[in-house]
Amino acid sequence: MRYIIILAVLFINSIHAKITSYKFESVNFDSKIEWTGDGLYNISLKNYGIKTWQTMYTNVPEGTYDISGFPKNDFVSFWVKFEQGDYKVEEYCTGLCVEVKIGPPTVILTEYDDHINLFIEHPYATRGSKKIPIYKRGDMCDIYLLYTANFTFGDSEEPVTYDIDDYDCTSTGCSIDFATTEKVCVTAQGATEGFLEKITPWSSEVCLTPKKNVYTCAIRSKEDVPNFKDKIARVITRKFNKQSQSYLTKFLGSTSNDVTTFLSILD
């Protein structure tokens, strides 16, 4: 009688076995499934075009499980199957290249004597102990990102937006040089072109306050030239002796006129 009761309990449990929730997510090709359900399950995966199921986990309870390396890194669909006794359920995914999300890039600012370098490090996938940048790799869906950087100078509340050209990028990241004497804060976001339509979150903001050994003034139009002339005139007065001031002031005047003429032609 005791054995009959035990068998009955097992039979009842198998009837009520059910996956109550399921979620697949892949960030930078770090792929995980999260699920809830009663009892222990065998979990396997099958890629489109392949007949056999690959066993990933055996007799495991609900939770979050890493399945990186099992789905193909391409556009083919795949299925995840849960089995407990006679109970089976299959979850469908449209394909890793479609589903994968790309995390934010990393922004690095480095000051040099006459300029500041902005380096945008590509998001990367982790394989074992290796970090592999996500940039035009066939085994990562040929994904590459075009970056937009927001520069905030000094006390300005409005950032200056700049689109990074892919010609400024290598397999590790993108690099541009600029100059400023003001504190600058930079954040960057990446986006793909084409039908994949992947957009990263904005990176953490990185700030740098340069040393005052280079004097610059932004000129966007001829209306900015007087401000440039006044600023450089103050530098000449405060940093050079009277003999040098005379020559430099004349040079500043002729340079300002040349810049104004050039900008007028562009207008």
From Swiss-Prot:
SUPFAM superfamilies: Fibronectin type III (SSF49265). One of its GO terms (biological process) is type II interferon-mediated signaling pathway. Pfam families: CR4_N (PF22325), IFNGR1_D2 (PF07140). Residues 1-17 form the signal peptide. Its main location: secreted. Induction: Expressed in the early phase of the viral replicative cycle. The keyword Signal applies. Glycans are attached at residues 42, 150. Belongs to the type II cytokine receptor family. Counteracts the antiviral effects of host IFN-gamma. Acts as a soluble IFN-gamma receptor and thus inhibits the interaction between host IFN-gamma and its receptor. Homodimer. Interacts with host IFNG. This is Soluble interferon gamma receptor OPG193. It comes from Monkeypox virus. The gene is OPG193.
